[in-house]
Swiss-Prot record:
UniProt keyword list: Cytoplasm, Endosome, Membrane, Protein transport, Transport
The protein's name: Vacuolar protein sorting-associated protein 26A-B
Subunit structure: Component of the heterotrimeric retromer cargo-selective complex (CSC) which is believed to associate with variable sorting nexins to form functionally distinct retromer complex variants.
Domain of life: Eukaryota
Function: Acts as a component of the retromer cargo-selective complex (CSC). The CSC is believed to be the core functional component of retromer or respective retromer complex variants acting to prevent missorting of selected transmembrane cargo proteins into the lysosomal degradation pathway. Retromer mediates retrograde transport of cargo proteins from endosomes to the trans-Golgi network (TGN).
Alphabetized InterPro entries for the sequence: Arrestin-like_C (IPR014752), Vps26-related (IPR028934)
Any Pfam family the entry gives: Vps26
Species for this entry: Xenopus laevis
Length: 326
């Protein structure tokens, strides 16, 4: 597979072909418009190598330039501030000195063992992307084309992965005990738990478990939080009784979430919460949120040769102003 730039006027087009394109995996990522794009998948520390092909479309033409270069770029873009684009990685390879092209030409490039410290991400208010950028420098207008890559950050099994167990309630009205089997889940994991009713003196009509994603961008007073309900799991529909125990099984893989991302380059975070919601007969809603960590498990082949590890320290979740917390 190669990346095709499209025409730059009538003279030439640019192609980028990776050396291992026949064997390298492809991954998907959603754009701001909700479309799904496929790009080659890379991990931290892997080299990026290939060829840049300048292909002439009209024989006999010539292209004067002031140099040709390729860059490997890692970039964070905040959608509410397009001018505040931050590059956390920028590697440059000069492919050609100033001169003139009269026919098609290929240039080899290689970025060795490239540091890729963060996962590719496309959210509501922020985008983190990696791309190759080819520039043909010209006197008036440069010819520039970008080719996106996808990066996944991998983690090993956490050293400690305690269960979550908590007793909550409303005094003399409702007391429940909920338990989740872990506090940290990989993206193909299953959330297993149970809800146990210790005291029920209000009429509960409906109960569900939600997987909530919070995207936090900015710092201090300029902080923006975008909340999305990734998944809903109906625990029960009807009134529970004292002593009743209800099991929970929520398959994370069916909802394709991202990993938890903590203070990425001091620009944004992505956090996940399990939100237990109860609705009574008067349509009043009660909830209890508990933060969990989502992480991407290394494939077996990679896990054998590399010791990936990420550590996360959960912070206290913030209560919603819209619903009373139990």
């Amino acid at each position: 597979m190669s990346f095709l730039s499209g025409l730059f006027g009538p003279i030439c087009e640019i192609e980028v072909a990776l050396n291992d394109s026949d064997t390298r995996k492809v991954s998907e990522i959603k754009t701001e418009e909700g479309k799904v794009e496929k790009h080659f998948l890379f991990y931290d520390g892997e080299s990026v190598a290939g060829k840049v092909n300048i292909v002439f479309k009209q024989p006999g033409k010539r292209l004067e330039h002031h140099g040709i270069r390729i860059e490997f770029v890692g970039q964070i873009e905040l959608f509410n501030d397009k001018s505040n684009t931050h590059e956390f990685v920028n590697l440059v390879k000069e492919l050609a000195l100033p001169g003139e092209l009269t026919q098609s030409r290929s240039y080899d490039f290689e970025f060795m063992q490239v540091e890729k410290p963060y996962e590719s991400y496309n959210g509501a208010n922020v985008r983190l992307r990696y791309f190759l950028k080819v520039t043909i420098v010209r006197r008036l207008t440069d010819l520039v084309k970008e080719y996106d890559l996808i990066v996944h950050q991998l983690a090993s099994y956490p050293d400690v992965n305690n269960s979550i167990k908590m007793e909550v309630g409303i005094e003399d009205c409702l007391h429940i005990e909920f338990e989740y089997n872990k506090s940290k889940y990989h993206l193909k994991d299953v959330i297993v738990g149970k809800i146990y009713f210790l005291l029920v003196r209000i009429k509960i009509q409906h109960m569900e478990l939600q997987l909530i994603k919070k995207e936090i961008t900015g710092i201090g007073p300029s902080t923006t939080t975008e909340t999305e309900t990734v998944a809903k799991y109906e625990i029960m529909d009807g009134a529970p009784v004292k002593g009743e125990s209800i099991p929970i099984r929520l398959f994370i893989a069916g909802y394709d979430p991202t990993p938890t991302m903590r203070d990425v380059n001091k620009k944004f975070s992505v956090r996940y919460f399990l939100n237990l919601v109860l609705v009574d007969e008067e349509d009043r809603r009660y909830f209890k949120q508990q933060e969990i960590i989502l992480w991407r498990k290394a494939p077996e082949k990679i896990r054998k040769r590399t010791n990936f590890h990420q550590r996360f320290e959960p912070q206290e979740p913030q209560a919603s102003a819209e619903e009373p917390e139990i």
